């Protein structure tokens, strides 16, 4: 055996119960569900670097997120880590991943899931209807071709919420990291066949993300081009609330032509851009094959709640280098909010980045492509030294932290940490890389009991020997907690998995009622005294009205971006909120016209507050957004910081 985690349906656990999670035919020793690396964004240091990978990472920068069920959230994740089995480069360029950059490679001897964090997760091949669970990654992969999962299966309820055509298709694969969903649906895009294509065309040896589906039957759909240069690429999205988005994509050839045209028409055209400086095609990189297709802008095309009031500009916009690397990000006000720089010799390897109004962070790499130094011009810098099963992190104050690791690939974990003050902590893990014990610097040990398959915590034993136990239902939802003193708290759920009652350790129960079978939002809550509160929600999941137990109602209004614009209390008491085109709160006005105003700097720091009587308070910041002085009523208080960002001097208004 390889020692890697595996579970087969029907196997008996140490407690005598059969395993209903896992594949019906897991090969013992197969690398089922093991990732090529730890999560790039899992453990970070500084601004930020993953020291276990030696990778520069930027975990989850969100550019677009409107409220609603199954919302279209457009975010970017960067990692300089290169997997040996990469998917094609995504729409943000090498090193970057979007939420939709999920791809399943179908091989004779393996399934390789390329996730949107830049990893490759290896599974065994699945027969129609089979499901497999990765204990190390807490992820399910299921192949269609089965009407229902067995009774008691963790996914039985979520699987049954899928449309029959999805459940029964053996050509579709589905993935999820929660028994409450949503599902990531992995299919293929329809293509217009060419004149020389053999019909019917065979299915491709991969699957792409075609949509999401939740336990209430709501869906998010990606529309991919069927013909032309953009064949197979996502150009439209319909979210779970019915909004429609258009994704504007450009090819490398289009960007090259635009750059040459711009160069020729520029007033500074003494040295026109050459074809070699901005090639029409891009070579493959260590991050995968590259078609050169990039996302340049996202437009909101339809909004059911605001059909006549659509934005006149894109919600977000992107520009790229001549090598197809993400260069800059612009928000809906067309303000540049991010900038990136890359290594000219290694396309996609980020060497610097900057936020609007902030200094530039820089990075150096060794010959193996690992970050060895990050340079902060206005704060702490860090150096990284890599040895076998040991990483040393030293900051610019010469403080040293040593990480001792065990395991490989996706099971690599820090088991011992030597801190700068000389203290040492230890951590223990099971065969799936899940935390089972922690020992602090004083030698006090806390232990975690885990469900052998799901990884849910079943008990926690503290250093004094006191034990807390946790119980779950078939859907891995917490149903009871028994404290060391024997007192118990309980939770109950309805068939779709919504919380319907919650009983505290003291025996008091709060109950939740739902009016909409297709929503997880409660209509009423009733506490232990019988007092009931009522809630009304918008189609986007925003609270429209709240009625307390006395019958008093508060109403709320929002704009198309989900920002609260008004609050109406009883007896005509109202507050109105206004925002600038970047979404920052600029004023709050009451029903009598009294207004408080807010001002900001380029970085988004609040620099001034002007009260209704005209009094003005101001705050100034250093390069990293720490307040260095506040002035109110002509009096100033100032602060100074050391390189680690700690306050070393505070001067009050009296000097």
Q: Can you annotate each of these PLM segments?
A:
Residues 24, 62, 184:
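Hydrophobic/aromatic beta-strand elements that line small-molecule binding cavities or substrate pockets
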